Amino acid sequence: MTQLETRTEPMVVNFGPHHPSMHGVLRLVVTLDGEDVVDCEPVIGYLHRGMEKIAENRTNVMFVPYVSRMDYAAGMFYEAVVVNAPEKMADIPVPKRASYIRVLMLELNRIANHLLWLGPFLADVGAQTPFFYIFREREMIYDLWEAATGQRLINNNYFRIGGVAADLPWGWLEKCRDFCDWFGPKIDEYEKLITNNPIFRRRIEGLGTIEKQDAINWSLSGPMLRASGVPWDLRKVDHYECYDDFDWQVASEKEGDCYARYRVRIEEMRQSLKILRQACDMIPGGPTENLEAKRLNEGKGSDAAGFDFQYVAKKVAPTFKIPNGELYTRLESGKGEIGVFIQGNNDVTPWRFKIRAADSNNLQILPHILKGHKVADIMAILGSIDVIMGSVDR
C-alpha cells in the first residue's frame, strides 16, 4: 500500500487596499502555505499627498490646517509638533496658561485616538458591541473640541506659534471635569466587557509577540514599544509642555503581544484622565470667567494680565521668518513618537520639512511578526499596531 503525499504550492493572496479591516488604503501581498503566513509585503503610498513638499511652500500659519489630515484620528498632535519646531528655533516662549490648554487638548486627543483604535480592533476580532460604546464617549470629546476650536474631528486649527488661537470659552473647564467624571466609570465598563473575557483573551493572547530587543531595534514607539517592556514615554523623557507639573505614571506591559498592547492603551486612557483632572484644577488663572473677572477688578497692572496668564505669547505676523539652522523636535502622540525635522534659511517658508510619523515606523515590523501565524490572525495583529494611512503615506 503506497502512502499518498500531499504537497501544497505557496499561494499569494492580495488583501486590500479596499478592505474594511485594512484601516485605510493599505495593501498586503501575503504568501500562504495552506493557512500559515510565509511572507507578507505591505504596499503603501495610496494616500500620499506630498505633505512635506506642501509644508515647504507654506508659512507655518498656512500649514497648520493641513496637518490634521495626516493622522485624521489625532490631528492635534501634529498641530502641536508643527508649531513646536519654529518655537524652539526662534526661542519663542509659551505662556503657562497656553501650555496647560495645549496639554488639555492633547490628552483629550489621546483618549479619542485610543477609543477609535479600540472599537475597530475589537470589531476585527469579532466583538461588535464595544464598537458602538466608544462612539458615545468620543462624541463628548468632539463637543469639547467644538466649543473650544469650532471644529469637531479634524481641521481644529487651534495651535499657534507661541500659544493657541483663542482662550477656552466660559464653562469649558467644568464641561471637561464632567467628561472626566463620566468617562472614568466607562473605562471600567469596557474592562468588565473585554479584559477578562475568555473568548477575547484566547483570541489575541500570544499573537504578534515582539521581544524587548526587537522593539528597540525596529525603532518602535508608543504603545507598541511600552507593551514590550520598555517604559519609554516622551512626556517623561523630553519634559515638553508642562507635563512635569502633573502626577501620572507611564503605562507598560512585558508580554509584547496583542493583549499587552490592548492593556497599555486602556491604562493610558486612565492616566490621561488623571492629567486632565489635574490640568483643569491647576491651570493658571482658572476658568476664563474667573480670569476675566480678576482682570476687571484689579484694573491696569493686574497680575492676572501677566505673561503666564495669556493664551498666546505674541501673535506671530504672517511674515514671521524661520531662522537659519536645523532642528528635530518630537512629542508623544497616541501612536508613538511623531517628529518634525525643520531646516530654516531665514525665510517665511522652511527650506526642508521632514515629518516622522509613528505608525509609519511601527508598520515596518508587520511582516516580521506575521510570519508563522495563521491567515485569520493577520487582521488582529495589524489592528493591534494602530495605523492611520494618512500619516503613514503623508
Swiss-Prot record:
GO terms for biological process: photosynthesis, light reaction. Keywords: Membrane, NAD, NADP, Plastoquinone, Quinone, Thylakoid, Translocase, Transport. It is a peripheral membrane protein. It is found in: Cellular thylakoid membrane. InterPro entries: NADH_Q_OxRdtase_suD, NADH_UbQ_OxRdtase_49kDa_CS, NDH1_su_D/H, NiFe-Hase_large. One of its GO terms (cellular component) is plasma membrane-derived thylakoid membrane. GO terms for molecular function: NAD binding; oxidoreductase activity, acting on NAD(P)H, quinone or similar compound as acceptor; quinone binding. Its EC number is 7.1.1.-. It comes from the Bacteria. It catalyses: a plastoquinone + NADH + (n+1) H(+)(in) = a plastoquinol + NAD(+) + n H(+)(out); a plastoquinone + NADPH + (n+1) H(+)(in) = a plastoquinol + NADP(+) + n H(+)(out). Pfam families: Complex1_49kDa. NDH-1 shuttles electrons from an unknown electron donor, via FMN and iron-sulfur (Fe-S) centers, to quinones in the respiratory and/or the photosynthetic chain. The immediate electron acceptor for the enzyme in this species is believed to be plastoquinone. Couples the redox reaction to proton translocation, and thus conserves the redox energy in a proton gradient. Cyanobacterial NDH-1 also plays a role in inorganic carbon-concentration. Belongs to the complex I 49 kDa subunit family. NDH-1 can be composed of about 15 different subunits; different subcomplexes with different compositions have been identified which probably have different functions. This is NAD(P)H-quinone oxidoreductase subunit H. The lineage of its organism: Bacteria, Bacillati, Cyanobacteriota, Cyanophyceae, Synechococcales. The gene is ndhH.
